[in-house]
Curated annotation (Swiss-Prot):
<keyword id="KW-0418">Kinase</keyword>
<keyword id="KW-0808">Transferase</keyword>
<keyword id="KW-0547">Nucleotide-binding</keyword>
<keyword id="KW-0723">Serine/threonine-protein kinase</keyword>
<feature type="domain" description="Protein kinase">
    <location>
        <begin position="82"/>
        <end position="366"/>
    </location>
</feature>
<dbReference type="Pfam" id="PF00069">
    <property type="entry name" value="Pkinase"/>
</dbReference>
<dbReference type="InterPro" id="IPR017441">
    <property type="entry name" value="Protein_kinase_ATP_BS"/>
</dbReference>
<feature type="modified residue" description="Phosphotyrosine">
    <location>
        <position position="242"/>
    </location>
</feature>
<comment type="similarity">
    <text>Belongs to the protein kinase superfamily. CMGC Ser/Thr protein kinase family. GSK-3 subfamily.</text>
</comment>
<keyword id="KW-0597">Phosphoprotein</keyword>
<comment type="function">
    <text>May mediate extracellular signals to regulate transcription in differentiating cells.</text>
</comment>
<dbReference type="InterPro" id="IPR000719">
    <property type="entry name" value="Prot_kinase_dom"/>
</dbReference>
<feature type="compositionally biased region" description="Basic and acidic residues">
    <location>
        <begin position="28"/>
        <end position="41"/>
    </location>
</feature>
<dbReference type="GO" id="GO:0106310">
    <property type="term" value="F:protein serine kinase activity"/>
</dbReference>
<protein>
    <recommendedName>
        <fullName>Shaggy-related protein kinase delta</fullName>
        <ecNumber>2.7.11.1</ecNumber>
    </recommendedName>
</protein>
<keyword id="KW-0067">ATP-binding</keyword>
<dbReference type="InterPro" id="IPR011009">
    <property type="entry name" value="Kinase-like_dom_sf"/>
</dbReference>
Length: 420
């Protein structure tokens, strides 16, 4: 929901880490210009840089928006009024502004999207079916009309004051790295949210990035937001490949694959985790081709088999052979071996070799979170991490459930207590 990170971030890391391979990398960059990799077209970029839609759509501070909600249990419709406070995010989709409910005093976020009459709004349909502790909650929705007869869809969402992006930048400004406990907390909650989206809803988010991860700064509960790019992926049906913000885009998307899977979200999660550990984006590409160059500089050249798994059309392309960069040199500090192992599971060129979201949740990197005595640095309890509903655990092998839900959490979870 925020604007993108600047492309310059992280370039010093790239230059510092690749002095000895600069000639190979230059060759790689030149050669790969011939690949005709599908990046965003000029039309796409124009759509991304449209002027913010603010005037006359009810987001001015103090503007009152009144709507009616269906009554519950046969009761009459209820009138609800929101007072706009200030804009918290803008983009090609429209805008998000903070508002307060006059009747209850509750603070909400309202996402206002220009409704194209030619298309049904997929985001609304998706959000109406979501219910999870790590997914932002849709309270209700309504349409509004301007003097020009333009129709806007308004999604009234729970308000979460911070994002992972702003939280990470606050550490960068102080020249500090984010404490490891927060890296674990945020990455785990992304994975748990994705496990729900992927397994329970068959949904791929397609734009996981720090700006789309909301965080409560007091509890450190994380919620995935912005389902404007999300889609239920159907095997055999093609999808657009130029989705997902560049730094977090899986290599198969850069290669133009159209029959990708939810594994693209797993790659993006690895990019977020690495960014939190590093203090800046791991793969700061300046174009589609340059993004692939950045990935190869760290992971090395993909094998022919790996390229085939990403997009069979490129198996004959001759890539210069570049060796992988050791992780301890990438991060220039000692990382726990569990962190390195999890990153390796996220960053597989072959989508089918990446770990699933559930497999990530049971990874030893998160064992500290399963300790019954684990606390936030200020001594407060951790946010709810193990309050699984039956739907979340459906189809998961019993031995995986045992690793997923620690014993102390089973006693607190009524469903788990009945089945343990």
């Amino acid at each position: 929901m925020e604007s993108h990170l600047g492309n310059g971030v992280g370039s010093s890391r790239s230059a510092k880490n690749t002095k000895n391979t600069s000639s190979s990398v230059d060759w790689l960059s030149r050669d790969m210009l011939e690949m005709k990799i599908r990046d965003k077209t000029e039309a796409d970029e124009e759509r991304d840089s449209e002027p913010d839609i603010i005037d006359g759509v009810g987001a001015e501070p103090g503007h009152v928006i009144t709507t009616t909600l269906p009554g519950r249990n046969g009761q009459s419709r209820q009138t609800v009024s929101y007072i706009a406070e200030h804009v918290v995010g803008t983009g090609s989709f429209g805008m998000v502004f903070q508002a307060k409910c006059r009747e209850t005093g509750e603070v909400v976020a309202i996402k206002k999207v220009l409704q194209d009459k030619r298309y049904k709004n997929r985001e609304l349909q998706i959000m109406q079916m979501l219910d999870h502790p790590n997914v932002v909650c849709l309270k209700h929705s309504f349409y509004s009309r301007t003097e020009n007869e333009e129709v806007y869809l308004n999604l009234v969402l729970e308000f979460v004051p911070e994002t992972v992006n702003r939280t990470a930048r606050s550490y960068s400004r102080m020249n500090q790295l984010m404490p490891l406990i927060y890296v674990k907390l945020y990455t785990y909650q992304i994975c748990r949210g994705l496990a729900y989206l992927h397994n329970c809803c068959g949904l791929c988010h397609r734009d996981i990035k720090p700006q789309n991860l909301l965080v409560n700064p007091h509890t450190h509960q994380l919620k995935i937001c912005d389902f404007g790019s999300a889609k239920v992926l159907v095997k055999g049906e093609p999808n657009i490949s130029y989705i997902c913000s560049r730094y977090y885009r899986a290599p198969e998307l850069i290669f133009g694959a159209t029959e990708y899977t939810t594994a693209i979200d797993i790659w993006s999660t690895g990019c977020v985790m690495a960014e939190l550990l590093l203090g800046q984006p791991l793969f700061p590409g300046e174009s589609g081709v340059d993004q692939l160059v950045e990935i190869i500089k760290v992971l090395g050249t993909p094998t022919r088999e790996e390229i085939k798994c990403m997009n069979p059309n490129y198996t004959e392309f001759k890539f210069p052979q570049i060796k992988p960069h050791p992780w301890h040199k990438v991060f220039q500090k000692r990382l726990p071996p569990e962190a390195v192992d999890l990153l390796c599971r996220f960053f597989q060129y072959s989508p089918n070799l990446r770990c699933t979201a559930v497999e990530a949740c049971i990874h030893p990197f998160f064992d500290e979170l399963r300790d019954p005595n684990a606390r936030l640095p200020n001594g407060r309890p951790l946010p709810p991490l193990f309050n699984f509903k039956p739907q979340e655990l459906s189809g998961i092998p019993p031995e995986t459930v045992d690793r997923l839900v620690p014993e102390h959490a089973r006693k607190q979870n009524h469903f788990m207590a009945l089945h343990s």
